[in-house]
Amino acid sequence: VKVVITGASGFIGGHLVTRLTGEGHEVVRIARRDLAHVDQLAAVFAGCNAVAHCAGINREIADQTYARVHVESTRNVAAAARTAGVEKIVLMSFLRARPNCGSPYHESKWEAEEIVRNSGLNYTVVKAGIVYGRGDHMLTHLSRALHTFPIFGLVGLKEKSIRPLAVEDLVHVMRAAIVDRRLKRQTIALLGPEEIYLSEAVRRVAEVVGKRPSLLPLPVVCHELMARVFERFMKVPLTSVAQIRILSEGVVEPGSPVVPVPYDLVPTRRFTTEQIRNGLPQGGPFCVGDLRWCS
């Protein structure tokens, strides 16, 4: 098949590109900054069988706002797909996305879902939890934080659970929706097979990188304040405000109704030492070079 992938240079989009090209499918790559003009997109989409819309952000930078990247871009992609006669659109969304929750990230992801569901196109909306793997934010920043700080601050005074989802399992499901044309007009939730506390996830990563940090529960408001500082001064923030909201809620239940995932597509990869090691970057501790004003 011929597939357009938006956000193709990002974490999930990049893994999807690798999977599909490895199977011999033709992939057209589009960056999230190239989604502003419907007519130009329609020309690119012409002759394509499907669009995988993976473009997204977890913090706002200048004109790259949640409204523009998640909502306006999705509206443009859906309109261009209709014009070009694309058969299928697969939207990458977030597990807890929902309306009227007070989080611009969650609400904009929900708006994108609604645009796709009401587009008239055959669609699959994939509401994924916390995804990890080579090139991710979770393992990359967690491991670097462990190399930098002897204390790790847990989000909230009462721990919440997560179900880490291997990017390989996510891409497997997206491939089924695109290539095999499964999951027609469905909104599904994808979570890893193992429910653990964030502290346990930190301990497992720490063991792999050879660190033994002290784990300290901190109020959510403290993390939000630190996240705002990170967003302001770091090129790629250690954490963002949206990520703190995500972790403070827990990531084990969808924020809106979904349909069950077929048995053969249910994620199976556990958050094991091998999986963690395969996804870890080569980088060490944070340094001055991570600050915005350093080249």
Please tell me what each predicted stretch does.
Residues 13-14, 71, 110:
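Residues forming the Rossmann-fold NAD(P)(H) cofactor-binding site
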Residues 35-84, 94-99:
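NAD(P)H-binding glycine-rich loop region in Rossmannoid oxidoreductase-like domains
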Residues 1-23:
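N-terminal Rossmann NAD(P)H-binding glycine-rich loop of SDR-like oxidoreductase domains
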Residues 25-32:
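Conserved glycine-rich Rossmann-like NAD(P)H-binding loop of the short-chain dehydrogenase/reductase
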Residues 6, 54-55, 89-95, 126-128:
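SDR active-site strand-loop-helix element
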Residues 177-239, 253-295:
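Mid/C-terminal beta-alpha module of Rossmann-like enzyme folds, strongest
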Residues 84-88, 121:
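A short helix->loop->beta-strand "cap" motif at the edges of active sites that frequently abuts
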Residues 100-211:
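Oxidoreductase cofactor-interface core, primarily capturing Rossmann-like NAD(P)-dependent enzymes
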